[in-house]
Regions:
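Generic structural motif
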Residues: 6, 72-74, 135, 146
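Extracytoplasmic electrostatic interaction patches
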Residues: 88-146
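Non-membrane alpha-helical secondary structure
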Residues: 7, 26, 87-90
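Sec-dependent bacterial lipoprotein signal peptides
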Residues: 1-20
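Short amphipathic alpha-helical segments that mediate assembly, nucleic-acid/protein binding
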Residues: 3-5, 31, 91
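N-terminal export/targeting and maturation segments
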Residues: 22-81
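Intrinsically disordered, low-complexity segments
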Residues: 19, 56-57, 120, 126
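Extended Gly/Ser/Thr-rich low-complexity repeat segments
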Residues: 79-89
Length: 146
C-alpha cells in the first residue's frame, strides 16, 4: 500500500514538472513579449518574426536577441505614437552596450520605444527596445536579459 502511494506521488510530481516545463516555453515567445512589453494588440496574421540573432543559451532567460518584424498596418500605426528619431541618450547607451554582440541596421527615419523591465537599477539588466523603420516598414525588437 505504501509503495502504491509512493508511486502515485512520484507520478504526480513528474506530471507537474512536465506541465511546468511545457508552460514555461510560453515565456520564450518573442511575439508575446513584444505585446506585453509595449502594450500592443497584434493578431497572429499581423506580425511575422524573423530571428536575426539569439544567444539565449545555458541559463534560462539570460541573453540577447534581435528579431525583424513584418507587421500589419494597425501595428505600424501604433508605432507612430512612439518616440521619433533620434534616440535618447539612454537608448544610445543601451545600444552601445550591446554593440559587441549585435547592431541594428542603419535607420534614418523611424520611431522607437524602450522598456526597462527591471526599473530601479542603475545597470541595464532586462530591457526591450523596439525600433520601427518608416522607409522599409520593418520593425526590430531587441531584448536583453541578464
Amino acid at each position: 500500500m505504501k509503495m502504491k502511494k509512493l508511486i502515485c506521488v512520484m507520478a504526480l510530481v513528474c506530471i507537474g514538472m512536465l506541465l511546468v516545463s511545457c508552460g514555461s516555453k510560453r515565456l520564450d515567445n518573442p511575439k508575446a513579449q513584444l505585446m506585453r512589453d509595449f502594450g500592443l494588440h497584434i493578431d497572429k496574421k499581423d506580425c511575422v518574426l524573423e530571428e536575426l540573432f539569439n544567444n539565449f543559451e545555458g541559463f534560462p532567460y539570460e541573453g540577447i536577441a534581435l528579431y525583424k518584424l513584418t507587421v500589419g498596418e494597425g501595428v505600424r500605426q501604433a508605432f507612430l505614437q512612439w518616440e521619433r528619431f533620434p534616440f535618447s541618450e539612454e537608448a544610445e547607451n543601451f545600444l552601445e552596450s550591446l554593440s559587441a554582440y549585435v547592431e541594428l541596421p542603419s535607420i534614418a527615419d523611424g520611431y522607437w520605444k524602450m522598456v526597462d523591465r527591471n526599473p530601479g537599477t542603475s545597470a541595464y539588466t532586462n530591457v526591450s527596445l523596439c525600433v520601427y523603420d518608416r522607409a522599409t516598414g520593418a520593425a526590430y525588437l531587441l531584448t536583453m536579459d541578464i
